[in-house]
Amino acid sequence: MKVFSNTHTFNYSWEEVSTANWRKYCPWNDKSTHVIAVDTLAREVDPATGILRTERLITCKQSAPEWLKSIIGGMETSQVFETSYVDPAAKTVTMVSQNITWANMVNVQETVVYRPLDAHRTQFEQDARITALCGGWQRIKSSIEDTLVTRFRENATKGKEGFECVLAMSRRVFAEEREKEKMRIEGKMMA
């Protein structure tokens, strides 16, 4: 098993980050063009805790190296099952994902947590555990795990840059909408 861990501080409030998280794979993010679809499978709020639980299926274009595709299958797309928990009281967003594609050959479990550092900054923590399940071929297992850790590292940089674009656009759009609403209310008061 190999582990990839990553942290980053976003200069946006937890409220901004937790809201923009749902738009992470939208056209505003030109770094996530590999994401073909994000399907929400289930969503519910626990009445006792107020925690929003969402299950999503994320479908991506495959970018695995050819040598790896030849070992574990040459599929063009891959799917990931994600369960997220938004806890407004504790101010945390926790996302846990598991690969569906190639699950009999490679197990990839990722956990991402967003939590506020202060009123204007949010801490991002990412932890991925990658285990190749290729029987006794330790050298091949290590090569697969090393390759996937490298991909996680590369994608972490792209993901951070893409989410920064989404956050900036979200802030701009929300500011414009607040201004429109303010003008609408002021217009009603003058009438």
Where are these regions (language model features)?
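Generic detector of isolated residues embedded in canonical secondary-structure elements
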Residues: 15-18, 83, 125
